[in-house]
Amino acid sequence: MTGNEVWFDAAKYLHQNKIAKPVMWLGDDRHYKKAKDIFSDDVLFMDTFVHYQENINQINYIDEKSEFFFSGNYLRAKDRCLKMMDRLDLYGSFSRQDREVVFNKISLFLLKKLSKEKPDALVMAEIAHSHAQYLVLEICMFLNIEIVKFNTWILGPLLYLESLQTGKRFEVDFEV
């Protein structure tokens, strides 16, 4: 959840130049209002997924990609996400069962949303470091959705996309 303006500007540029259209924006909440103005209903409030899952309503999940719950992706995501949720439990009042309910609720929401929207790729500005971000990553891997991450090179003003699955860098003919 980087608050850097450059990541918002990159998404805005891709959208305005009809290179990419977000089907789900789950970015830093500092950009929420600006992103909502540009990307409309495709913008989700990150705090809802990380801290206030009770605000996720009307999932209307039937059985979209229910085989996810029997996959290695589910088991890996559950193990890692439940551990990531430990960081949110300041007072020790969040039981294992509570964590599993939250994890499965977010899973159902994401499976419904990603099955309906059928995105071409998951584009990340950074490696997932919250349970919600990591769950999106695992579900996209399960659905065979291309996952790319922006990388920067410290020695020069270089920004490039790299596939998380293959490590391949994408060549783009682009002048600044």
What kind of feature is each model-predicted range?
Residues 13-110, 152-176:
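Conserved N-terminal ligand/cofactor-binding loop architecture of enzyme catalytic domains
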Residues 5, 30, 130-131:
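Short alpha-helical
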Residues 7, 80-82, 118-121:
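Generic detector of bulky aromatic hydrophobic side chains
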Residues 3, 103, 129:
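Charged, low-complexity surface patches
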Residues 109-173:
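Conserved nucleotide-sugar donor-interacting segment of glycosyltransferase catalytic cores
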Residues 1-4, 27, 123-126:
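Nucleotide-activated donor-dependent transferases that construct or modify glycoconjugates
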Residues 9, 34, 135:
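Phosphate- and divalent-cation-binding pockets in alpha/beta enzyme and binding domains
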Residues 1-16:
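Charged, amphipathic alpha-helical stretches
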